[in-house]
UniProtKB/Swiss-Prot annotation:
An MF annotation (GO) of this entry: cholesterol transfer activity
Assembly behavior: Homotetramer. May interact with ABCA1; functionally associated with ABCA1 in the biogenesis of HDLs. May interact with APP/A4 amyloid-beta peptide; the interaction is extremely stable in vitro but its physiological significance is unclear. May interact with MAPT. May interact with MAP2. In the cerebrospinal fluid, interacts with secreted SORL1. Interacts with PMEL; this allows the loading of PMEL luminal fragment on ILVs to induce fibril nucleation.
Family under the similarity heading: Belongs to the apolipoprotein A1/A4/E family.
Chain residue ranges for the region called LDL and other lipoprotein receptors binding: 152-162
Lineage: Eukaryota, Metazoa, Chordata, Craniata, Vertebrata
Organism of this sequence: Thryonomys swinderianus (Greater cane rat)
Name recorded for this polypeptide: Apolipoprotein E
Length: 299
C-alpha cells in the first residue's frame, strides 16, 4: 500500500513539474524566410503572430484599439493572394498532365489552401474576441484573459504550422507534376520534330531529281523570256532612232527655209544700201572734180 502511495505521489509531482516547465517555442520552417513569395508572406504573418503572443504592453494597447487585427487582416490577405498566384502559375504548367490527375491534385491543394485560410481567420477572430472580453471584463481578471489567450494562441500557431507545412508539401507535389508534365511535353515535341526532320529529308531525297528538272525548265523559260524582251528592246531602239532621224531632217529643212526667208528679207535692203552708197560715192567724186577744175580756169 505504501508503495502505491509513493508511486501516486511521484506521478503527481512529475505532472506538476511538466506543467511548470516552459513549452518549447514553435519554430517556423527556414523556407519561410527565403522561399516562394507566398512562403515569405506567411513568414511575415507568423512573425507578427509570435510578437502578438508575447502580450507585451504595446501588444495589449494595440489589441484594444483593433490595430493588431487590422494588421493581421492585411498579412492574411497578402498570404492568400500569393498562394493563389503561385497555384495559378503551376496550373499553367500542367498542360500535358492527365485531366483526372490534374483535377485530383487541384482538389487536394484547394482543400489545404482553405485550411490555412481558416487557421489565419480563426487567429484574427480569437484576437477580436479577446478585445471584446477585455473591454467587457465580465467577472474575469485581465490576467486570466491573457493566460487563456496565450494558451489558445499556442494551439492556433501549432495548427497553423501543421496546415502550412501540408500546403507546402502539396504545392511541391503540384510543382513536381508540372515539371514532369513539362518534361514529357518537351520530349514529345522533340520526338515530333525529329520525325518531321526525317520526313523532310526523305521527301527531299525523293523529289530532288524532279526539282532539278523543273529548275532547268524554268531556267530555259527565263532565258527565252529574256531574249524576247531583248529583241523587243532592240526593235524599240531602232524605231526611236528612225524617229530621231526624221525629226532632225525636219528641223534641218525648217532651218534652211528660215534662212532663205531671212535672205529674201535682207537682200533687197542690202542692194538698196549698195546703190545708195554708189550714188553717194559718185556724187562725192563729181564734187571733188568740180572743185579741182575751178582753180585751173582762174590761172
Amino acid at each position: 500500500m505504501k508503495v502505491l502511495w509513493a508511486l501516486l505521489v511521484v506521478t503527481i509531482l512529475a505532472g506538476c513539474r511538466a506543467e511548470v516547465q516552459p513549452e518549447l517555442e514553435v519554430q517556423a520552417p527556414a523556407g519561410w524566410q527565403s522561399g516562394q513569395p507566398w512562403e515569405l508572406a506567411l513568414g511575415r504573418f507568423w512573425d507578427y503572430l509570435r510578437w502578438v503572443q508575447t502580450l507585451s504592453d504595446q501588444v495589449q494597447e494595440e489589441l484594444l484599439n483593433s490595430q493588431v487585427t487590422q494588421e493581421l487582416t492585411v498579412l492574411m490577405e497578402d498570404t492568400m493572394k500569393e498562394v493563389k498566384a503561385y497555384k495559378s502559375e503551376l496550373e499553367q504548367e500542367l498542360g500535358p498532365m492527365a485531366e483526372d490527375t490534374k483535377a485530383r491534385l487541384s482538389k487536394e491543394l484547394q482543400a489545404a489552401q482553405a485550411r490555412l485560410g481558416a487557421d489565419m481567420e480563426e487567429v484574427r477572430n480569437r484576437l477580436a474576441q479577446y478585445r471584446g472580453e477585455m473591454q467587457a471584463m465580465l467577472g474575469q481578471s485581465a490576467e486570466e484573459l491573457r493566460a487563456r489567450l496565450a494558451s489558445h494562441l499556442r494551439k492556433l500557431r501549432k495548427r497553423l504550422l501543421r496546415d502550412a507545412e501540408d500546403l507546402q508539401k502539396r504545392l511541391a507535389v503540384y510543382r513536381a507534376g508540372a515539371q514532369e508534365g513539362a518534361e514529357r511535353g518537351v520530349s514529345a515535341i522533340r520526338e515530333r520534330l525529329g520525325s518531321l526532320v526525317e520526313q523532310s529529308r526523305l521527301r527531299a531525297a525523293l523529289t530532288s531529281q524532279p526539282l532539278h528538272e523543273r529548275a532547268q525548265a524554268w531556267g530555259e523559260r527565263l532565258r527565252g523570256r529574256l531574249e524576247e524582251v531583248g529583241g523587243q528592246a532592240r526593235d524599240r531602239l531602232d524605231e526611236v532612232r528612225e524617229q530621231m532621224q526624221e525629226v532632225r531632217a525636219k528641223m534641218e529643212e525648217q532651218a534652211e527655209a528660215f534662212q532663205a526667208r531671212l535672205k529674201g528679207w535682207f537682200e533687197p535692203l542690202v542692194e538698196d544700201m549698195r546703190r545708195q552708197w554708189s550714188d553717194l560715192v559718185e556724187k562725192v567724186q563729181v564734187a571733188v572734180r568740180a572743185s579741182t577744175a575751178a582753180p585751173s580756169e582762174n590761172h
